[in-house]
């Protein structure tokens, strides 16, 4: 257990330092803009490119793994959406936000750093594949559902064009595809460029985690919404359990790939859920509360999951 604590403490410690710094130092929220720009447009794309470009091409074309992992995430989304819409009688827009809160994990800011730290560089490819295709799905579903709910005043063709543009030009997706192309062509960047990529990649995890802590501090918890009662268990427990079962039933996967997918599924609600709510003017305060609560509780749940993985108590294939 001491080994697991040694893995998790620096990771969540960076989030805590970001939170503490934001509470102690009086800076406006806009001051985070350039740090987030550095993370989203430079550091994390460099990390994805570096890791994917060094991977054998055959490992980058596992459509079965992609469909199973993304499909499992949307099973959780559909379940929470149905609870919100039919049992709680919320609007389509509110139920959509609840679905994202229960299924959209913080795989961008938390995923790469934690997976690589806990499972090694072999985890890089499943992290990149899950992140790339899951975010492409989120970028498609969110505006489509909000348009169906009447939360968007744009014409369907404009919505569709916006979705395609957002997916095609997202820096994470572009860097992943660039990494795939480099792997296919066996391209190695010149040494000065490779060093620059390395510097940016090394900055990705600490900057992203610190920024996440600051973001949590800037959105203080005002009240605990009732939906927390089913969203939190769905995100922190149901999602990783279903991911584990689906991959165990779905085929023969590398144990590290299974463990990576389960670990990513166990992560707390993504800060992008608040951004979506803010964009459409729905469920903003509750999204902020959900992100904060799931992040706090994930210290225990993620630590427990890592203990199961590292101790061998969680076999890679439940049905060998």
Swiss-Prot record:
Membrane topology: Multi-pass membrane protein
Homology family: Belongs to the auxin efflux carrier (TC 2.A.69) family.
Localization of this protein: Cell membrane
Transmembrane segments: 1-21, 32-52, 65-85, 113-133, 167-187, 196-216, 256-276, 289-309
Keywords: Cell membrane, Membrane, Transmembrane, Transmembrane helix, Transport
A Gene Ontology biological process term: transmembrane transport
Gene Ontology CC entries for this record: plasma membrane
Name the UniProt record assigns to this protein: Putative malonate transporter
Organism field: Rhizobium meliloti (strain 1021) (Ensifer meliloti)
């Amino acid at each position: 257990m001491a080994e697991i604590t040694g893995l998790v403490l620096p990771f969540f410690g960076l989030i805590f330092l970001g939170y503490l710094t934001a509470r102690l130092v009086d800076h406006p929220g806009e001051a985070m803009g350039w740090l987030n720009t550095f993370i989203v447009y430079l550091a994390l794309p460099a990390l994805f490119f570096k890791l994917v470009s060094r991977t054998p091409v055959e490992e980058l074309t596992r459509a079965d793994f992609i469909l199973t992992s993304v499909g499992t995430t949307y099973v959780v989304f559909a379940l929470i959406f149905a609870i919100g819409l039919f049992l709680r009688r919320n609007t389509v827009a509110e139920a959509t936000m609840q679905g994202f809160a229960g299924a959209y994990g913080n795989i961008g800011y938390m995923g790469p750093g934690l997976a690589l730290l806990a499972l090694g560089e072999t985890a890089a490819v499943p992290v990149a594949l899950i992140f790339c295709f899951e975010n492409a799905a989120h970028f498609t579903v969110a505006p489509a559902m909000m348009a169906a709910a009447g939360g968007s005043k744009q014409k369907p063709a404009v919505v569709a064009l916006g979705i395609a543009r957002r997916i095609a030009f997202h820096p994470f997706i572009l860097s992943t595809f660039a990494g795939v192309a480099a792997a296919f062509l066996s391209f190695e960047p010149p040494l000065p460029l490779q060093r620059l990529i390395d510097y940016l990649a090394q900055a990705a995890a600490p900057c992203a985690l610190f920024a996440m802590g600051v973001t949590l501090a800037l959105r203080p918890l005002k009240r605990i919404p009732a939906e927390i009662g089913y969203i939190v268990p769905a995100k922190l427990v149901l999602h990783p359990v279903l991911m584990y079962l689906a991959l165990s039933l779905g085929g023969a996967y590398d144990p590290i790939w299974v463990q990576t997918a389960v670990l990513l599924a166990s992560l707390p609600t993504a800060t992008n859920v608040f951004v979506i709510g803010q964009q459409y003017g729905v469920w903003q305060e509750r999204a902020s509360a959900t992100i904060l609560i799931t992040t706090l509780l994930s210290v225990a749940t993620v630590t427990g999951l890592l203990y199961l993985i590292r101790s061998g108590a969680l076999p890679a294939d439940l049905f060998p």
